[in-house]
Design a protein with these regions (language model features):
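Short beta-strand-loop/turn "lid" adjacent to the catalytic site in phosphate-handling enzymes
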Residues: 52-104, 125, 131-140
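Short glycine-rich, Thr/Ser-proximal phosphate-binding strand/loop in the N-terminal lobe
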Residues: 1-39, 210
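Catalytic phosphate/nucleotide-handling subdomain of diverse soluble enzymes
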Residues: 200, 205-241, 247, 311-342
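Phosphate/pyrophosphate-binding loops at sites that engage ATP/ADP/AMP, CoA/4′-phosphopantetheine
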Residues: 51-66, 172-179, 294-305
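Glycine-rich beta-strand-to-loop/alpha-helix junction loops that act as flexible
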Residues: 71-74, 190-193, 304, 308-316
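Glycine-rich phosphate-binding loop of actin/hexokinase-like ATP-binding domains
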Residues: 132-237
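Adenine-nucleotide phosphate-binding core of ATP-dependent small-molecule kinases
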Residues: 247, 254-258, 265-300
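Internal helix-turn-beta structural module
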Residues: 280, 284-308, 314-382
């Protein structure tokens, strides 16, 4: 982009439920919170636009200064392998993908519809979480289920956090001044939700999340990898239906379910230091699962050149990065503990000069990717 300055940032929380608020950083860099009941997305976007044009808090004078709008859309299925300009056909395909992401795509659509109503005629672009992973080979994305289920319902691995994995992998190569298309990269986006991706020669070749964001790593409230037979066993024992099982594995499991303390890794770390035995188990499981995926993806790619940590935990929790890299010298990972212990939330190489694998922290910036893709697509339409 010609100009890459951030002129406004913020987000709406708790839309449609009590306690909704808009958090933003004003033009002076001060954090501001506006408490206001927000019934739906249209009302929320109207509030955002009123703030953007506010004389004191805003950065533009009128809505017509907005050239385009970029949207994050969680699931594009096999229909989208890149970001696209939104039209009626694209909207129809996003609607078709709602059954694959019933918790996310409908909300994404609400934002698009609201913006179309408030800013009619303004170009809008959809940037899909799943698009980056559409380069996976079939043997990586297929499940060992009857092939007809893939043909009828699209049951396969799709992966998520693609916008983040794309950004941090490219940014790491820019920092290291190495060609993106010639690297074997493992990106670890770890936080309350988390996923790991193997990127070989500039393409995603495998990723830990699956048909849904539940598969893979142990997360804040999601169980991650689990024997499917466990679910039918629990359904029979507890008398649970499909909706209750979905709630169990999405909202009641993960480090929260194991520890009984919190889904927040910062609070879990405090509990570990206090000697809470269940918190210790949860923390150990969290790191162990990440380590296993790093080893698996190194095997899948025949080695690894760069390991990237990002996400809330990856960027800030030094102890977790240490735990993941411990005893990984056999594949060429040598952590510089003195540097690692001081790095939080900023770009930095945290491996030793002798390390065959470069380990680097790269704060993610999905909003930049959305803005960049929107600019690129808008430019192509002119």
């Amino acid at each position: 982009m010609e100009s890459e300055a951030v002129i406004a940032q913020g987000g709406l929380e708790r839309i449609g439920i009590p306690g909704s608020r808009l958090k933003l950083v004003d033009s002076k860099g001060e954090k501001v919170t506006i408490e206001k009941d927000i019934a739906g997305h249209e009302e929320g976007i109207s509030l955002i636009l009123s703030v953007l044009t506010d004389e004191k808090l805003g950065c533009i004078k009128a809505y017509n200064e907005i050239d385009a709008v970029g949207h994050r859309v969680v699931h594009g299925g096999e229909k989208f392998a890149s970001s696209v300009l939104i039209d009626d056909e694209v909207l129809a395909k996003i609607v078709e993908c709602c059954e694959l992401a019933p918790l996310h795509n409908p909300a994404n659509l609400e934002g698009i519809y609201a913006m179309q109503k408030i800013l009619p005629g303004t170009p809008q672009v959809a940037v899909f979480d799943t698009a980056f992973h559409q380069t996976m080979p079939d043997y990586a994305y297929m499940y060992g289920l009857p092939y007809e289920l893939y043909q009828k319902y699209g049951v396969r691995r799709y992966g998520f956090h693609g916008t983040s994995h794309r950004y941090v992998s490219r940014r790491a190569c820019e920092i290291l001044n190495v060609p993106y298309e010639k690297q074997r990269i493992i990106t670890a986006h770890i936080g309350n939700g988390g996923s790991i991706t193997a990127i070989q020669n500039g393409k995603s070749v495998d990723t830990s999340m699956g048909l849904t964001p539940v598969e893979g790593l142990l997360m804040g409230t999601r169980c991650g990898d689990i024997d499917p037979g466990v679910l039918t066993f629990i359904m029979n024992k507890e008398g649970l239906n499909a909706d209750k099982v979905s709630n169990l594995i999405n909202k009641d499991s993960g480090v929260l379910g194991i520890s009984g303390v919190s889904s927040d890794m910062r609070e879990l770390e405090i509990a570990v230091k206090e000697g809470n035995p269940r918190a210790i188990i949860a923390m150990s499981m969290y790191g162990y699962r990440i380590k296993k995926y790093v080893g698996a993806y190194a095997a899948a790619m025949g080695g690894v050149d760069i390991l990237v940590f990002t996400g809330g935990v990856g960027e800030n929790q030094t102890s977790m990065r240490k735990a993941v890299c411990q005893n990984m010298e056999y594949i060429g990972i040598h952590l510089d503990h003195a540097i690692n212990d001081t790095i939080q939330g900023k770009e930095m190489v945290i491996s030793t000069p002798e390390s065959k694998v470069t380990v680097i922290v790269v704060p993610t910036d999905e909003e930049y990717v959305i803005a960049s893709d929107t600019q690129d697509i808008l430019g192509n339409q002119v």
